[in-house]
């Protein structure tokens, strides 16, 4: 269980009254006695595309923190109202210029090494893409490239490291 505390809201976002505390399901919850709103902290969701071709994996080189200067799978946060598969398609297109052909759920992790939030849920998909020209997203990434699965560059996120380790074992079989 993560030990990061959620935001400390003082006032109700709906009616503006001062929030109190109530115990629900054995946990302290911020609560508005005026309009009966209860704050349930949530974690964000992200998707990541594991794209493998001919023993090589497609990675992007991070341009911003956290983990600036390290490599990762093309990934991004799920926006409100968006299905994780829609996020995957959007992020792959934005970060690589490629179009998703097929995606299969590979694994789900709770990220514990994101300093920006109380962790997030990372959904990894084994992803096939249509042939096309690689196009780097200069706003988010320094570079993009195909790497030998057995000799990847430095991977930043721990969950991305786990998936890369799995891929290396899978290729050895």
Identify what each model region corresponds to:
Residues 2, 52-94:
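Conserved Nudix-box catalytic region and its N-terminal flanking loop in Nudix hydrolases
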């Amino acid at each position: 269980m993560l030990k990061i505390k959620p935001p400390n809201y003082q006032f109700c976002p709906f009616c503006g009254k001062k929030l109190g505390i109530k115990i629900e399901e054995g946990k302290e919850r911020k609560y508005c006695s005026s309009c009966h709103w209860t704050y349930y902290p949530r974690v964000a969701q992200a998707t990541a595309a594991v794209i493998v071709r001919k023993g090589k994996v497609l990675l992007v080189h991070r341009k911003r923190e956290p983990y600036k200067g390290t490599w990762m799978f093309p990934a991004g946060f799920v926006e409100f109202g968006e299905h994780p598969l829609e996020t995957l398609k959007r992020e792959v297109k934005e970060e690589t210029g490629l179009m998703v052909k097929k995606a299969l759920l590979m694994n789900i992790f709770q990220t514990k090494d994101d300093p920006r939030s109380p962790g997030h849920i990372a959904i990894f998909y084994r992803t096939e893409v249509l042939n096309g020209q690689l196009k780097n997203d200069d706003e988010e990434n320094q570079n993009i490239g195909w790497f030998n699965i057995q000799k990847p560059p430095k991977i930043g996120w721990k969950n991305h490291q786990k998936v890369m380790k799995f891929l290396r074992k899978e290729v050895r079989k």
